[in-house]
């Protein structure tokens, strides 16, 4: 631990079905007795901004991976669009509020964050551990089948669709 940084964060990125968030993230949070932020971050960003949590959730669903990673490549610089602007509820500004909350939380508590481009948002912080969780494709398909109660072809379609949103394709199987 760095003496100037009493808190730490673990930023988990993962492939769909790997268990990175639903299992590993939860286990780490439990072991360290700290909060796990995933969709919970939307509520905090809503409280911070005064923007409806539903708008954050809608933007999150609409932009899922592509927007988060496109915006996050510039890394949050502290700028937030003011309420009087027509772009106040733009996807970029909603992302900026989430990034702002992630950075501010690091001054208040240790936490685990799953997704939310936290690895990019917090990459300049020395007290952040970034973890990437992956698993074999067939294992992830099995996991999604059980988690969602769906068949193999549906699980494959679901995983492949999410991967296509971030322009990643599975190696030839």
PLM region spans:
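Extreme N-terminal, non-catalytic leader segments
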Residues: 1-7
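Residue-level detector of conserved catalytic or cofactor/ligand-binding positions
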Residues: 164-172
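Glycine-rich phosphate-binding loops of nucleotide-dependent enzymes
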Residues: 152, 159
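ATP-dependent NMP and nucleoside kinases share a basic, alpha-helical "lid"
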Residues: 97-148
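Glycine-rich phosphate-binding P-loop
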Residues: 12-26
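ATP-dependent small-molecule kinase phosphotransfer cores
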Residues: 46-110
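Short beta-strand-centered segment that lines the nucleotide-binding/catalytic pocket of NTP-utilizing
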Residues: 35-46
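Residue-level preference for the first positions of well-ordered beta-strands
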Residues: 7-11, 110-112
């Amino acid at each position: 631990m760095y003496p100037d940084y009493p808190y730490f964060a673990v930023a988990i990125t993962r492939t769909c079905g790997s268990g990175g968030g639903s299992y590993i993230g939860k286990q780490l949070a439990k072991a360290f007795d700290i909060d796990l932020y995933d969709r919970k971050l939307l509520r905090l960003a809503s409280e911070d901004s005064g923007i409806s949590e539903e708008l954050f959730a809608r933007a999150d669903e609409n932009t899922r991976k592509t927007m988060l990673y496109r915006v996050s490549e510039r890394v949050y610089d502290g700028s937030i669009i003011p309420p009087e602007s027509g772009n106040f509820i733009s996807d970029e500004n909603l992302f900026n509020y989430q990034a702002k909350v992630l950075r501010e939380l690091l001054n208040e508590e240790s936490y685990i964050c799953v997704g939310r481009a936290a690895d990019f948002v917090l990459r300049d912080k020395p007290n952040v551990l970034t973890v990437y969780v992956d698993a074999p494709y067939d294992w992830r398909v099995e996991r999604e089948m059980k988690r969602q109660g769906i068949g193999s072809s549906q699980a494959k379609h679901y995983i492949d669709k999410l991967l296509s949103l971030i322009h990643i394709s599975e190696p030839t199987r």
